[in-house]
Amino acid sequence: MSDSRTRELVARYVGVWGEADAEQRRKTIEELWAEDGKHFLDPPAEFREVASGLGFGFAASTLEATGYDELEARVARSYEEFVAGGEYEFRPRDNAVRLKDVVKFSWEMVATATGEVMGGGLEVLQVDADGRIVADYMFPN
């Protein structure tokens, strides 16, 4: 995968999290991920604390979505929570690197009114020979 293809993958990946049209979002998910692709989320500390306080053993758990339906639900929920109201948008940082079948980059969540960075994270994608995501590791900060 060339540098331009890596940048395109990153742009499309970050873009799908802000896609308003549900049909287009699903189509893009099916284009980006392999059919049995996985998304792993390292939950923020606040999430772990709340879950632990409710008696769940999530202190060190990783959340996982597998396959198009679960991936679509995960992306849609993030869209609804952060983007749909118009308050925030996601954007990639210009630091994507590829090493064999792994792409690493950072992303930011910015306030649409001010451009202020409100959050972000590190993303590590493993892709197959066709450039489709087989494993997606998200580390929000």
Regions found by a protein language model. Give the residues of each.
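C-terminal and inter-domain tail/linker signature
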Residues: M1-N141
